Amino acid sequence: MDWSIREGARVINMSFAGPRDPMMTRAIQVAASRRIAMIAAMGNEGPGAPISYPAADPNVIAVTATDQTGRLFAAASQGTHVTVAAPGVEIILPAPRGGYQISSGTSVAAAHVSGIAALLLERQPDLDPAQLRQILQETARRGATPDPQLGAGVADPVPALNAAVRPTEPGVPMVTAPPVAPVPDTAQAPAPVAPGTDTAQAAPPPAAPRQATVDPGKAEAKD
């Protein structure tokens, strides 16, 4: 974290959780004084676990995980400090030794929100962490029955990016979500997976290359 601060990072993702640590608290205070957005995972210790840091630090955007239906990840740690949720159940990720793996957890969700924060800063570089938090909360998707365990709701990059544009800015195209291809409900693993294991190796076929261009005079991207 000290290295990230020295190198001038605008967003720091903290996909880890544990007890409060004085050295980490000091580093967070330094990062906050330099207007660095910090996003952390709530943790995966379940609803009865003590609150975890750094997510519980007031300077940090705390992220929990949801499944494909928008429901809270069963193993997610809980607390009133959660800011938003993001997809974090059975997500296909790059594997450490190549290929891909399917993984679940609030760490995955935190990285998702860190990516949204980076896009917001690219679109509007003068946003500070408090403004990023506000945009994420105000544009989050809420279910028919709001769930306080999800904070403000599930972070949604499209309305968040549009909210980051000043109304007086000319020539900045708005963002629209492209159609999403259906995802198969099953994936084939190369070897049997033991019960209770939370990751499995998978090798989906590579997608066909695509090119996209953006017409600044219109509101959507075209293939």
What does each of the following model-derived ranges do?
Residues 2, 6, 26-33, 55, ...:
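Solvent-exposed, polar/charged alpha-helical surfaces in well-ordered, non-transmembrane soluble domains
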Residues 66:
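Carbohydrate-associated surface elements
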Residues 162, 168-223:
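Compositionally biased, proline/threonine/alanine/serine-rich low-complexity intrinsically disordered stretches
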